[in-house]
A protein has these predicted regions:
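Small side chains
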Residues: 11, 17-19, 50, 134, ...
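A mid-sequence, solvent-exposed acidic-amphipathic segment
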Residues: 169-205
């Protein structure tokens, strides 16, 4: 069985090509793990267009319809104009009740739109980690901590260090996040995780992360140097994942 897995990953690596390495994207288009941001950065001069399915357990507690959580989708456009900055624009579908008497369709979709930014003031060195600061939906204002529309509003600082072990890469990531809205309090505080990139499949990666409330596992890879795929399980049960097209500007 181990031989079959190794053969599969090697095939994925060959499809991806040897010139591009995976730099996993979180669901906002900003480089990170699955839910937790890191101090890694996208290649300079690249744009990324993608879409993700977000399980109801993956989204803020306030995203409910008739008292229940629901799965949704988002899409984003992200750019990395310089080695030290990333920007993205994210649109997420929201489920709302309709205002008419159409019994055939009692709900409709709205959208939450917001910007994300990440800055890396310190690049990774031999003896020190990379450091980054960032924000998701930083321009959102809330009158109180119930934060009716501040679904994703948060700020963070992250550190990342990579170790080379006989050609295999092990990444260690530590993040502190502050979500302003009380309904996202479960994600306030320390988060982090580890990433592993095998020597025989350098464009593929596995990760394990702790969000402050959940433990997530995921795998991702690049195919044909352009198409990024990520699939993960929240607490080993709830699937979220997506795809992204990366373009060199």
């Amino acid at each position: 069985m181990n031989g079959r897995i190794r053969t599969f990953l090697l095939g994925v690596s060959l499809l991806a090509g040897s010139g591009w390495r995976v730099s996993a994207q979180e669901y906002t288009g900003i480089t990170g793990m699955m839910h937790v941001p890191t101090a890694e950065m996208a290649p300079t001069g690249t744009a990324r267009i993608g879409a993700f399915f977000l399980n109801g357990e993956f989204t803020p507690a306030k995203l409910t319809y008739k008292g229940g959580k629901y799965g949704t989708y988002n899409h984003f456009l992200a750019i990395a104009p310089f080695s030290w900055v990333e920007l993205s624009y994210v649109s997420t579908l929201l489920k709302h009740p309709t205002n008419n008497n159409n019994v055939q369709k009692q709900w409709c979709y709205g959208k939450d739109r917001h910007f994300c930014i990440k800055l890396r003031p310190l690049e990774e060195g031999i003896y020190w980690p990379a450091l980054a600061i960032g924000a998701q939906d930083p321009t959102r204002t809330i009158e109180d901590k119930s934060g009716d529309y501040a679904y994703f509003n948060n700020f963070y600082v992250a550190a990342s260090k990579h170790l080379d072990i006989r050609g295999h890469e092990l990444g260690v990531h530590l993040t502190y996040r502050y979500y302003r809205s009380d309904f996202n309090a479960r994600w306030r505080g320390v988060a982090g995780g580890i990433t592993y990139r095998p020597a025989f499949a350098p464009n593929s990666r596995a990760l394990l992360e702790y969000t402050g409330d959940d433990v997530n596992v995921a795998v991702d890879c690049y195919l044909w140097r352009l198409l990024f795929l990520q699939a993960g399980l929240q607490n080993g049960r709830y699937f979220s994942g997506g795809l992204m097209l990366r373009i060199q500007l």
